[in-house]
Amino acid sequence: MASPALISETEAWKDLKAHLEGIKMTHLRELMGDTERCQSMMVEFDNIFLDYSRQQASPDTISKLYKLADAAHLKQKIDRMYNGDHINTTENRSVLHVALRAPRNSAICSDGKNVVPDVWNVLDKIKDFSDSVRNGSWIGATGKELKDVIAVGIGGSFLGPLFVHTALQTDPEASKNARGRELRFLANVDPIDVARNISGLNPETTLVVVVSKTFTTAETMLNARTLREWISSALGPSAVAKHMVAVSTNLPLVEKFGIDPNNAFAFWDWVGGRYSVCSAVGVLPLSLQYGFAVVEKFLQGAHSIDQHFSSAPFEKNIPVLLGLLSVWNVSFLGYPARAILPYSQALEKLAPHIQQVSMESNGKGVSIDGLPLPFESGEIDFGEPGTNGQHSFYQLIHQGRVIPCDFIGVVKSQQPVYLKGEVVNNHDELMSNFFAQPDALAYGKTPEELKKENVSEHLIPHKTFTGNRPSISILLPTLDAYRIGQLLAIYEHRVAVQGFVWGINSFDQWGVELGKSLATQVRKQLHGSRVKGEPVEEGFNFSTKTLLTRYLQATSDVPADPSTLLPNI
């Protein structure tokens, strides 16, 4: 008998649907009172502790989710990914970001070829180059050392490396290695982003890393040309060869741009942009800032989770458990969003990165076979570090919409502070909130409890907390390069699990194409209006035509053929 075309047609899915009503009638106060249940919902791997006991789920729910995973052939799909099968069917590609952090002696194949030697050839090249820049043997056009790096990219070429960079900035080992150096990221085509990036920098001491697989990405290449002009106008056109390098596979365009092809660092079609932080996309700028040895520890951390994900049984597999629980929350309980709440300021860029990884991967409306999905998939990801978020959007999380939360805590602070006379130290104060918030969400506060506290009758409705709001807690022992790599890989694989169960392609992103193609028409119109004085053509709808006309009229002072003007800040 053939497998159902959609996961929602399986008996396992229908069984969970039938199970749902009983769970909805059971409050987390009751579920949390079952110690045996709570113990069964705690998992540890390599000193990473996951507690999912505050999920609206019973042991029976979890058992049924394992059956759903079996019905979705989850294990086989994970194996196919690791085996290099073309699981990205719409682009006919392997999905092998796990190969980017595999040990040198590993064998991971795509189209019958072991790709690990190619990965390590690039890593070795990055190590040699970053060492030469850091030790001063590679110098700029005027003989000065290159202490500042601007990485130019967008999307996955920006968000992932920025997350890791921000997390490493306050790690003692990494910050020591980065002393006297600066790493910045230029992503937005808005000239303000250019101005902010070059502010205070000297072209003589700046190295630019241009990240574009095809070397045709519109925003990235415009920003790259802008920085090329910034360098050339200060140091002369020949300086580009010493002050700009590329992460790309299109060597002819790299050379045409003015960058020596020998200073181009490759990555491959089997690396998706949002999964590329462990490739030259992230490893090159991060190695220039922190040294290759630190970045190698980051890769080793990611690899440890890759091994765990591929080999651990589902009941002890952290990414699998997190992925299945997300499917439960989204497709069955109907919660459309997820809050990522790291109680570590060093992780302030985690949520924006996972927002892309998750929403670009699983923001799909059809199955991998092109069938419309009759259920909700994907979720809206957002977040902010604690305790800042508590003074921002936690009001809604506690008393408004139900939003499942990921609480991420770190046992040992990167930068501990102890003040004499304080009741607790700064990190203990932070962690007091980390431990309290999940219980506040789960238990809430009843009108009866408020009456016992002699709260005024008219305030009781306003001070009541319904509770029964699900969360998970992840406790990391430290936050160093290794643990940052582990955290990244946990979320990457969690997203893949969700897509595998929903039966969608988590590794393409056709949704970004339509807006880009329409922008081409607008770009052509702006050029025609600026240079030739052409009116806005009839090809636009009334609204867009009105907005475009208004914009052009208000910027009529923009010269048709301007001389070069760079930001002055």
UniProtKB/Swiss-Prot annotation:
Q: Which domain of life is it from?
A: Eukaryota
Keyword list, A-Z? Cytoplasm, Gluconeogenesis, Glycolysis, Isomerase
SUPFAM superfamilies for this protein: SIS domain (SSF53697)
The record's active-site residues are 360, 391, 516
List GO terms (cellular component aspect). Answer: cytosol
Extent of the signal sequence: none
Protein EC: 5.3.1.9
Main subcellular location: cytoplasm
Write one Gene Ontology MF term: carbohydrate derivative binding
| PANTHER family associated with the record | GLUCOSE-6-PHOSPHATE ISOMERASE
What do we know about how this protein assembles, alone or with others?
A: Homodimer.
Family membership: Belongs to the GPI family.
The protein's name? Glucose-6-phosphate isomerase, cytosolic 1A
Instruction: Give the encoding gene's name.
Output: PGIC1-A
